[in-house]
Amino acid sequence: MVKLSGILEYSMGGFLCLRGFADYKTLSRVSKENPDVQRSLIEEHKGEMAEFLNRGLYRFFPEVVLSVSLLSNNNYADVERFFETVRTFGSWKENLGNINISIFNHEAGDKNRVAHFAFDESIVQLNRVDGNHRLSAADEVTSSFKVPFCLVLCRNTDEESQYSRAIFHNINSKQIPLKLEENLKVILTSENAFSNEVLKTDPSFGWAYYLARVAAKNINFSEYPFINLLIQQEKYTFLKETFDSLLNSGYLPKADIAFDMFL
């Protein structure tokens, strides 16, 4: 039996969600890839994620988003009664289909509703809306830790299919992501925060980061007008991706001499 606990609330007045923390491997085990929205796994990225989660000093990621349909054996009336109970701040302590749900309303303080969801993972499997790559690396991760999760509760499978597509779309299209160049510049120009040794050894970064930093400091691109024209405002991206390619192909070693060989 698996138990997930957290705060039960309508997120931004829309989706009913259970938000909390749970064991990483447990979340991976009780959830599955959602073919409606998930991209195919890239094995190389899976390995990088596993290394990061096993050894990364800066190990962190946002909550994984999961979904579940509460409909089971045509229990439409019970599902509607549950949503009405939540909407009217009532208490609940009974099975809803294959899930045992308990809701406790606090009369004082911040008014948060604590809820516990218990279910048999051989019967109930959660769907992954966002975070599939992170959860799929669990079989290669040796350490144990908790991660934040958001479980979106749906009235039926049709609603779950609609909600998961909409949420996946909003997560991946509504935000304005930083360009890779801006991300790299933050790391490579912050030597006081991220030493050369950290760049070399921490799985969050790697030798390509270190060599890109060294190259950016020591190469005057104005002396190479054609290259300068090509990379324009993406110097750090160009250097990092170039060193990634050279290191992965074996043309350069993961050693300080690599920069001299590059020149």
Where do the model's predicted regions map?
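Short catalytic/ligand-binding loop motif for oxyanion handling, primarily in non-cytosolic enzymes
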Residues: 72-75, 135-137, 157-160
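N-terminal extension/subdomain marker
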Residues: 1-118
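Hydrophobic, Leu/Ile/Phe/Ala-enriched alpha-helical segments that form helix-helix packing faces
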Residues: 49-56, 138, 171, 215
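A sequence-level detector for short glycine-anchored, His/Arg-bearing signature motifs
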Residues: 118-140
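Short His-Asn-centered micro-motif
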Residues: 67, 128-131, 152
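Conserved aromatic-histidine-acidic binding/catalytic patches
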Residues: 37, 41, 121-129, 159
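A structural signal for well-ordered alpha-helical segments within the folded catalytic domains
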Residues: 43-47, 132-135, 165
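Solvent-exposed functional surfaces
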Residues: 122-125, 140-263
